[in-house]
């Protein structure tokens, strides 16, 4: 049970912590001003809510 909690809490913190372009790049993401293209998903923002940080699956 403790291991499950550790895994779930680590995963949720990863996706919520990306708020600038440096953190985006560290998490192997890239910044785009539109929707995340193709087989990528949004993991945060880069320069405010309009610029998305995207990462491939």
UniProtKB/Swiss-Prot annotation:
One of its GO terms (biological process) is cell chemotaxis. Keywords: Antibiotic, Antimicrobial, Defensin, Disulfide bond, Pyrrolidone carboxylic acid, Secreted, Signal. Neutrophilic granules. Disulfide bonds join 24-53, 31-46, 36-54. Has bactericidal activity. Active against E.coli ML35 and S.aureus 502A. GO terms for molecular function: CCR6 chemokine receptor binding; chemoattractant activity. It holds the Pfam family Defensin_beta. Gene3D superfamilies: Antimicrobial Peptide, Beta-defensin 2, Chain A. SMART domains: DEFSN. This is Beta-defensin 3. The modification Pyrrolidone carboxylic acid is found at residue 16. Its main location: secreted. The keyword Disulfide bond applies. One of its GO terms (cellular component) is extracellular space. It comes from the Eukaryota. Belongs to the beta-defensin family. It is found in: Secreted.
């Amino acid at each position: 049970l403790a291991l499950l909690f550790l895994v779930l809490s680590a995963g949720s913190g990863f996706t919520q912590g990306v708020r600038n372009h440096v953190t985006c790049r560290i998490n192997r993401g890239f910044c785009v001003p539109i929707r995340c293209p193709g087989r990528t998903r949004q993991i945060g923002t880069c320069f405010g809510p309009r610029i998305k940080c995207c990462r491939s699956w």
